[in-house]
Amino acid sequence: MSTSGPITEFPAPGLRDPFRYITGHDAEGNAVFVQTDNGDHRAVMLGGAAAQNIIYSAGSNPIELTGNVDLEFAKNRPSLHIPNGVCVRMIDFAPGCKSNMHRALCMGIGTVCEGEVELTLGSGEKRILRPGDVSINRGAMHQWRNTSDEKPARMLYTLLDIKPLIVNGKQLDFDMGYLMKEYAEYDEGEGDKKAE
């Protein structure tokens, strides 16, 4: 990990605090906004290299909306990804921030909202993503880097659970490296791939 300056809260300096608008239905069945706020479970990550904001989470897929079951689930801080569920996580990266190479065993759909981010795969292949660009990560080892040494970058990730991933007859392992320090309290961080 490298960074030219710590982030002390979400949002990162220079980025706006996003609103989320959650819809639902009133007692008569009319479509209404049931919640308007700035997200839940904000946290500074990795000593200020990044900060996250949980935009939405649900403990099932298909998602149970009846009786606001999903909104009740979302009151608790979710893990990195949710078995049989979904997590939508916004991450601000400090200028120059570079993650370690890692793999979360989930479908990670990442959209660049602000700045420019380099995505490097375990093979060494690289792509530069700009605002509006989307990465569909299907369990690949990868690394993120904010290409600017002056401005923060922001990405929005939708993380969906997957079935065990078999490549060349071998089941791939969860491997977050030092990023697991942010998620070590969760079962998926147990074992030899837990933070060192």
From Swiss-Prot:
UniProt enzyme class: oxidoreductase
Lineage, highest ranks first: Eukaryota, Fungi, Dikarya, Ascomycota, Pezizomycotina
Origin superkingdom: Eukaryota
Function field: Cupin-domain-containing oxidoreductase; part of the gene cluster that mediates the biosynthesis of sordarial, a salicylic aldehyde structurally related to the phytotoxin pyriculol. The most interesting aspect of this pathway is formation of an aromatic product from the highly reducing polyketide synthase srdA. SrdA synthesizes a reduced polyketide chain from one molecule of acetyl-CoA and five molecules of malonyl-CoA. The polyketide chain is then reductively released as an aldehyde.
Inducers of expression: Expression is up-regulated during sexual development. Expression is also up-regulated during confrontation with the arthropod fungivore Drosophila melanogaster.
Protein's organism: Neurospora crassa (strain ATCC 24698 / 74-OR23-1A / CBS 708.71 / DSM 1257 / FGSC 987)
Single GO term (MF): oxidoreductase activity
Keyword terms, alphabetized: Oxidoreductase
Stretches assigned to the Cupin type-2 domain: 92-156
Identification of the protein by name: Cupin-domain-containing oxidoreductase srdB
Pfam families with a match to the protein in the record: Cupin_2
Family: Belongs to the virC family.
Documented EC number(s): 1.-.-.-
InterPro entries registered for this protein in UniProt: Cupin_2, OryJ/VirC-like, RmlC-like_jellyroll, RmlC_Cupin_sf
